[in-house]
Regions:
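Membrane-proximal intracellular helices of multi-pass ion channels
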Residues: 1-169
Length: 169
């Protein structure tokens, strides 16, 4: 158990799932008039199902408020942890990308300082970071391209984005 709490990916995944569940619960209580327990149950199940890309559904989230649907699409986009069979970009890549951007911003603010990106105490080589950035860019561009093509074909924007992200994942 202690090793898990030192793992950057696990902590980020836990924060992501907790925040998404809390935000969707709040949004369902506010926008759909669900009770607190009912909203939490639907939100927690859908967040777990979508982030692991298992595809199970406990409620028709197509009728949920747009904010909840947007969070669900974001969870589809991110996906699960490294080594899992879930789709998406993976949490590890998001953590590395975030740390890379943070490091670049920090270096711009303090040019004399050398900022290294570390993951679980290990310094990440520059070629790994650039490979993650390239993968992220290509993934985003393909999602945007597929969504754009579907929008041109008359599919509503949010539906096109959802289909594009779920197909890519």
């Amino acid at each position: 158990p202690r090793v898990l709490w030192k793992n950057s990916e696990f902590k980020a995944y836990l924060v992501m799932l907790t925040a998404a569940t809390a935000l969707i619960t709040w949004n369902l209580m506010d926008g759909m008039d669900f009770s607190g327990t009912q909203a939490f149950r639907y939100a927690a199940f859908q967040v777990a199902s979508i982030s692991s890309t298992t595809g199970f559904v406990s409620n028709d989230f197509d009728v949920w408020p747009s904010f909840s649907k947007l969070l669900i699409i974001l969870l589809m986009f991110i996906g699960g942890c490294a080594g899992s069979t879930s789709g998406g970009i993976k949490v590890t890549r998001f953590v590395l990308l975030f740390k890379m951007v943070y490091s670049l911003v920090w270096q711009k603010l303090h040019p004399q300082m050398l900022a290294h990106v570390k993951m679980n105490g290990q310094e990440m080589p520059e070629n790994v970071l650039y490979s993650v950035a390239r993968f992220f860019f290509v993934y985003i561009m393909l999602c945007v391209l597929w969504a754009f093509l579907m929008i041109c074909d008359g599919v509503p924007a949010l539906a096109a984005i959802g289909v594009s992200v779920s197909t890519m994942g």
